């Protein structure tokens, strides 16, 4: 039986459960349940703290897991990504008191508070910077005001929370994170087919969230230009219409770009442009 770790709480929990449900797997009915057996798919799900999931998967006790890329990197567990899931996006950056221009090199000899000490130490080592890293499990932003640290390294969203504590982010992101499906690095043939099947199912759901099907009628004389705009995955589907000067075109397009793509098609003479949702896709 395939053994899969799922976040039991936090921002990753509900989207992960929703994707697995859409992929055809059994969903837990009580948030207190720590395990759910899905006999129809021969899978057992374990609901664990997101920060612990990579450790369980890396040890080989579980076959697959859903966690954050930053959490997997921080764990230092021997895991690898099978699939990026498209939710839970965040950046991990340094921040320090506002009022001056900061650079990572300015951290030399200073105290840095963070909930991700391994990520920070690796980054500092790569830059040749020596600093004191202080591990805190939460409310990292307040550490500077309390005199515990000179700077922090933390997950940054809009920057509003940093601003409330008179902090400003600086330098490049240490980690661009999102939810990922992971497996043990060097995982062998045991349960390989089952791992591949779950990955394919989940990938189909993620793809359906990120792409739309675009149909439109196109004058033949601008078909080459139109297919440059909508190349599809492999190639667009092109079918003749009753009017020989026109063809019907169908192609998958990124959801985030659909309006600009429709604008381009309309500008070159395409008509009846229709975007449709897709629920699943297999490659």
Curated annotation (Swiss-Prot):
Q: Which organism is it from?
A: Mycobacterium sp. (strain JLS)
Swiss-Prot/TrEMBL GO biological process terms: L-histidine biosynthetic process
Q: How is the activity of this chain controlled?
A: Feedback inhibited by histidine.
Where it sits in the cell: the answer is: Cytoplasm
Concerning its family, UniProt says: Belongs to the ATP phosphoribosyltransferase family. Long subfamily.
Q: Name one GO molecular function term.
A: ATP phosphoribosyltransferase activity
Origin: domain of life: Bacteria
What biological function has been recorded for the protein in this entry? Catalyzes the condensation of ATP and 5-phosphoribose 1-diphosphate to form N'-(5'-phosphoribosyl)-ATP (PR-ATP). Has a crucial role in the pathway because the rate of histidine biosynthesis seems to be controlled primarily by regulation of HisG enzymatic activity.
Q: What class of enzyme is it?
A: transferase
Q: In which pathway does it act?
A: Amino-acid biosynthesis; L-histidine biosynthesis; L-histidine from 5-phospho-alpha-D-ribose 1-diphosphate: step 1/9
Pfam family of the protein (one): HisG_C
Q: What is the protein named? A: ATP phosphoribosyltransferase
Gene3D superfamilies linked to this entry: 3.30.70.120, Periplasmic binding protein-like II (3.40.190.10)
Subunit details:
Equilibrium between an active dimeric form, an inactive hexameric form and higher aggregates. Interconversion between the various forms is largely reversible and is influenced by the natural substrates and inhibitors of the enzyme.
């Amino acid at each position: 039986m395939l053994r899969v770790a799922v976040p039991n709480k936090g921002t990753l929990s509900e989207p992960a459960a929703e994707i697995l449900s859409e992929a055809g797997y059994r969903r837990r009915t009580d948030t207190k349940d720590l395990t759910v057996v899905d006999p129809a798919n021969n899978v057992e799900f374990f609901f664990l703290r997101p920060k612990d999931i990579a450790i369980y998967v890396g040890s080989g006790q579980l076959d697959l897991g859903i966690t954050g890329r930053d959490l997997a990197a921080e764990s230092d567990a021997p895991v690898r990504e099978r699939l990026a899931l498209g939710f839970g996006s965040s950046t991990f950056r340094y921040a320090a008191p506002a009022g001056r221009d900061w650079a990572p090199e300015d951290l030399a000899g200073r105290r840095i508070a963070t909930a991700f000490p391994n990520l920070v130490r690796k980054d500092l080592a790569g830059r040749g910077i020596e600093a004191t890293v202080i591990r805190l499990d939460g409310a990292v932003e307040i550490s500077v005001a309390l005199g515990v640290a000179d700077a922090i390294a933390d997950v940054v969203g809009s920057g509003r929370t940093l601003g409330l504590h008179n902090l400003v982010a600086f330098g490049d992101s240490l980690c661009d994170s999102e939810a990922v499906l992971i497996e043990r690095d060097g995982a062998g043939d045991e349960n390989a087919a089952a791992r591949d099947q779950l990955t394919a199912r989940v990938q189909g759901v993620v793809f359906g969230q990120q792409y739309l099907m675009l149909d439109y009628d196109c004058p033949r004389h601008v078909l080459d230009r139109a297919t440059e705009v909508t190349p599809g995955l492999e190639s667009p589907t092109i079918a003749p219409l009753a009017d020989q000067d026109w063809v019907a075109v169908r192609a998958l397009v990124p959801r985030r770009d659909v309006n600009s793509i429709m604008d381009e098609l309309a500008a070159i003479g395409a008509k009846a442009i229709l975007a449709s949702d897709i629920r699943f896709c297999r490659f």
